[in-house]
Amino acid sequence: MSKKPVRVAVTGAAGQIGYALLFRIASGEMLGKDQPVILQLLEIPDEKAQNALKGVIMELEDCAFPLLAGIEAHSDPMTAFKDTDYALLVGARPRGPGMERADLLAANAQIFTAQGKALNAVASRNVKVLVVGNPANTNAYIAMKSAPDLPAKNFTAMLRLDHNRAASQLAAKGGFKVGDIKKLTVWGNHSPTMYADYRFATVDGKSVKDAINDPAWYKDVFLPTVGKRGAAIIAARGLSSAASAANAAIDHMRDWALGSKGEWVTMGVPSNGEYGIPAGIVFGFPVTTENGEYKIVEGLPIDAFSQECIDKTLAELQGEQDGVKHLL
């Protein structure tokens, strides 16, 4: 028996990440090869953006994806999020030249307050929300706070790109296959302060840390490389990472929806006080996922260096949050 289609809303749908994302969702890569989807695509009510969205929709139609049960174009979140089961909030205000961080936070607070309110009003009560648009953790916090009738746990931020970047760097250094690396995690904010933690990581049951055995490389090369990878891609490509961000969004949602089969993955989720992170802060944690629910991996020992890194990324997140509290 064929499954009933689920509704997937994507904001910023005509942008670079949207373009790298939509075809993969429609082909079944995110929710499974047996799950039909209806795409509810949101773009700003600007003629150029709406025309670009029309072009993307034409291409989606021209792929004749068997799982694509419908496509809708929207300029209002109140219609785009109607009954949606999954919402990928990709569209955000990018930082322009000479723009202060406070201005960026304020501009995004406006967007994510409106989107949170719309989700609260019209989305499915079980909607799974992934915020991709930066600053992702704080934007997820804003949307969550603007949707008091939805469970806070339904709002997540994307740290999977940092996680995947970290796995790739460790694989290259240690000569491992990237898919063999288990129990890697990234703590904190999706920003250069994130802390990619390899202390528990294994390949074939053996410690990655012991196999690499180079603490100076870990601190002086690995952590800055992962933290500044986005900037390095902009410098090289002249554009921000879009395909890798879309890929991470697919990974995050697929594992949340279909389960991580006991493996650790990194998700930015609202804290309940785990590891001393104040409740409500959207923070990168190691999680396992099953039956559409995530669970933070608890009880991991935190050494002095790790605590220092976690405190640093937490302080940055608290600063961002304090910067938007008056707007909520």
From Swiss-Prot:
Query: What does the record list as coiled-coil region(s)?
Result: none
EC number per UniProt: 1.1.1.37
Keywords, in A-Z order:
NAD, Oxidoreductase, Tricarboxylic acid cycle
Q: Binding positions for substrate?
A: R95, R101, N134, R165
A GO molecular function assigned to this protein is: L-malate dehydrogenase (NAD+) activity
Question: How is this protein named in the record?
Answer: Malate dehydrogenase
Q: Which GO terms describe its biological process?
A: malate metabolic process; tricarboxylic acid cycle
Per the record, the similarity remark reads: Belongs to the LDH/MDH superfamily. MDH type 2 family.
Binding locations of NAD(+): G12, A13, A14, G15, Q16, I17, G18, N108, Q115, V132, G133, N134
Reactions catalysed according to its record: (S)-malate + NAD(+) = oxaloacetate + NADH + H(+)
Record's Pfam families?
Answer: Ldh_1_C, Ldh_1_N
Q: Which residues form the active site?
A: H190
Does NAD count among this protein's keywords?
yes
- Keyword NAD listed? The answer is yes
Q: What does this protein do?
A: Catalyzes the reversible oxidation of malate to oxaloacetate.
